[in-house]
Amino acid sequence: MPDHIYSHSFAQFLRNADNSVVNINPYPYVAFEDVFDDTFLRECLKELKSYLTAHFKETDLFKVFQTTDLANLEDCIRDAHTNVPNLIRLREHLYSPGFRGFVSTVTGTGPLDGAVDCSCNIYTSGCHLLCHDDVIGTRKISYIIYLSDPDCDWLAVDGGQLELYASDRRTVPTHTPVVSILPSWNSMVMFEVSPGRSFHAVREVSAEMKTRVSISGWFHTKERHIKRNQRETSTLDQLHSMIPATHAEWAVLHVNRVLSPSYSLVQDLTKWINPEYLRSESVKRVRQVFEADGSVQLFNFLLPHIAEPIKRKLNREDCRNSRHRCMYDHGYGDSWVVQGPPHVQRYLSYQPLECTLANKRSNSGELLKKLMCDLFESSSFQNWVRAVTGSVCDLAHSEVRRFRPGFDYTLAHAGTKRCSSEIDVTLCLTSGPNPAEWLSGDLGGFKCFIPIGSKSDRADVYEEIGEEQNMRSVTPSFNCLSLVKVNTGIGDFVKYVSTSAKSSRWDIVCRYST
């Protein structure tokens, strides 16, 4: 195998390679440093910056800039062999029989196919890739070559680490990663793609002046007789059979079938709700909007003397936790329980076993729990929902949630697809020092409702969300109640909350089956 593109030390290793360098925990992977000749790799980076166009892509799973597949360099770049000769050489060496044989030897896998499957991924500040296992089609080995700035060391505080997750006996990833690898210049990571094992993520890049650049791709197995169900199993499809995401139990609510709020109903709600939303004219107007659009947002929903103490309490909680924001377990405790698994979701749910007087006085979760129980789970509120939506509500799932910056999200997948119509009622209590920052969407934390498609084993199974998909998005805003009609076949997600957010997304969510 030609070795003139490699560093001297790596070229020597290539000639005597074995699998002794493989780490086995949490699953087989190998990490190399000083892989390529420094001058050669700098030329690759220069060509990449000069001739390749990176397109912004964002879904529930990731936020990244990505170039075209490097297999298509000759089709995308005029005079490619003249303008990007080093990128072409790199691609040809990576998928040459010699290097594929080296990968097979080091990883202990069987023969690998020569099909080129790689691209350049660019992570600027705020970009991320959430937990998944890469299982699509015939992928066998995943690899990443890092081309971040060669003249500026990458530090842990910059984010962008490749994170590897362990799995339990049910092939479900643990809540937090066990291995973290910095995207250092001229390093390379490889790991075997394995269903229910090779869970990994790219932590959000938090450095404003650094860019995480990598060439990543897959080596595919040569075996053409893989069982059909194994070959077509993607991370998205596996969510049908995985251990379900954790959440609170559903509760039966006994709803009086009234067409509009009665006097006693209104009296019960005047202690909590802005009186504007209790007037008969307003109820009719809200219902008209809801029936026409399928959703409505009601701002300043709670009375000021209810909302303001909540805001102060939640802001203090975010400030109190700010010193530990880099730690995955920050915010745990006081009956706040992490909900997972992380290839489906990660957020904190308030689930008290019992409430002591101390908890009532000091715990922000208990404050929200009381609001949920006294207002949202009351028959008066349920009948108000009936009046403003025109829907009879029979079942409800209610929950107090916290989505922490830099950690938390939910993903859209088959498990969130509704089998029957529902009314999603969410009181968002997100504030922070500058609430307007949430409006752009750059901080994440918004809630989306989208159609959930059928199974697929395509490499782009996590498709970009386009306007043609009739996506409905609700931006986080303090003291805002949103009501959304969720039809059969629709799923939802809460977009990952960026580390740049100054506060968590706090909410109380209720789902009514209609």
Curated annotation (Swiss-Prot):
2-oxoglutarate binds at Y146, R212. Binds 1 Fe(2+) ion per subunit. It is an enzyme of class 1 (oxidoreductase). Keywords: Dioxygenase, Iron, Metal-binding, Oxidoreductase, Vitamin C. InterPro entries: Oxoglu/Fe-dep_dioxygenase_dom, Oxoglutarate/Fe-dep_Oase_C, Pro_4_hyd_alph, TPA1/Ofd1_C, TPA1/OFD1_N, uS12_prolyl_hydroxylase. Pfam families: 2OG-FeII_Oxy_4, Ofd1_CTDD. It catalyses: [ribosomal protein uS12]-L-proline + 2-oxoglutarate + O2 = [ribosomal protein uS12]-(3S)-3-hydroxy-L-proline + succinate + CO2; [ribosomal protein uS12]-(3S)-3-hydroxy-L-proline + 2-oxoglutarate + O2 = [ribosomal protein uS12]-(3S)-3,4-dihydroxy-L-proline + succinate + CO2. GO terms for biological process: peptidyl-proline di-hydroxylation. Residues 114-221 form the Fe2OG dioxygenase domain. The keyword Oxidoreductase applies. The keyword Iron applies. One of its GO terms (molecular function) is L-ascorbic acid binding. Its cofactor is Fe(2+); L-ascorbate. Fe cation binds at H132, D134, H200. Signal peptide: none annotated. Its EC number is 1.14.11.-. Coiled coil: none annotated. Belongs to the TPA1 family. PANTHER family: HISTONE ACETYLTRANSFERASE COMPLEX, PROLYL 3-HYDROXYLASE OGFOD1. Prolyl 3,4-dihydroxylase that catalyzes 3,4-dihydroxylation of 'Pro-61' of small ribosomal subunit uS12 (RPS23), thereby regulating protein translation termination efficiency. Monomer and homodimer. This is Prolyl 3,4-dihydroxylase OGFOD1. The gene is Ogd.
